[in-house]
Amino acid sequence: MLTWPAPQIPELPGRGDVVRVHDSSTGRLVVAAEGPSASLYVCGITPYDATHIGHAATYVAFDLLGRAWRDAGQQVTYASNVTDVDDPLLERATATGVEWQDLAVEQTALFAEDMTALGVVPPDVYLGAVETIPPVAAAVEELVAAGAAYRVPLEEGAGGDAPALGDVYADVTADSAFGQVSRMDEATMLELFAERGGDPGRAGKRNALDPLLWRRERPGEPAWEAGSLGTGRPGWHIECAVIARAGLGLPFDVQGGGSDLLFPHHEMSTSHARLIGDGDVHGVGAATHVHAGLVGYQGEKMSKSRGNLVFVSRLRAEGVEPMAIRLALLAHHYRSDWEWTDASLTEGVARFETWRSAVSGNGGPDADATLAEVRAALADDLDAPRALAAVDRWAELSLAGTEKPVEGAPGVVSRAVNALLGVRL
């Protein structure tokens, strides 16, 4: 799958600090990646209703992580996916009378346009669910052979030419570490599993929390040949485990996404990753799990199911400067839940115009301290609001003209804002 064009990242003097992030599993700040390299997997979109502000906030947040790593001198490998076949996509295609493939292509392209406009660095490895069906099917077969997965009988009419081959589910009891990512009690897991695409009440399952690995063919649904599994398509969680393994290897440094992915998605995909290693060596998935807060609108979480969405593409079509949108997102710490309002965007536009005016001259206040403050803020759990405040102070002094101007300082600030915050002035 093709990504979008990569923005140019200016060179800055010196090096950034070691980046620490909040690990959702432990609740502690930890070094995001040790050593000269860093690896990141961010769960991608299901391509319908792209790209809303909640999506954008997540991808901008993890774009900051990649930028901070690069500034610290680390070689970054970033992988992501597109879930281009899944129940919600199929349901939307049916409801709107379009082919699901056409909807996926259209929305994936729109997402790429929005990410380009927002200055998000694209993944190095970018794979769709459809193009990775062969390795996903092989991983599911591996789990079945190891006794970590089992079949559940189908309802009448399902299964195509081989109805005796049931759906395949992972047995969560095969993973002794299951639950260590989210650290939730079983009652909470069951509640969230039911809310977020799971099927705890499915007859024939060994455990209510067992997740789907391979869904057999149903009438009117797309399906692919998969050897001993029978025709069908993959479950959601196993896709990410396999794509992360293919793109980054196991283990990798950080798995990121919205906080609503902590359970079941990241718990399940990490569990699968533990069990699909080669031979006796089992991967542990991500060393650190990092989650972005949720964005609300009109008093509720912004979500596709509620339909209360604000789209990046519509804002762009209305003539809103994409960098102002990015600044509106960066005004909130990535882990916080917050509400999108018209005032959020107004503040982003005003900040963008102020910064652009402040860097327009040949001289300005010394930039060294500002660069150091921005670097320190990002190294401290990607504290974008603190970084923005540092640039605000420099801009205020620059526009006031009360300090002796330092030649070249505006250029340093402009390059720093671009390289570290992803804001082109």
Swiss-Prot record:
A motif ('ERGGDP' region) lies at residues 195-200. The keyword DNA-binding does not apply. Binds 1 zinc ion per subunit. GO terms for cellular component: cytosol. It comes from the Bacteria. InterPro entries: Cys-tRNA/MSH_ligase, Mycothiol_ligase_MshC, Rossmann-like_a/b/a_fold, tRNA-synt_1_cat_dom. Monomer. Belongs to the class-I aminoacyl-tRNA synthetase family. MshC subfamily. This is L-cysteine:1D-myo-inositol 2-amino-2-deoxy-alpha-D-glucopyranoside ligase.
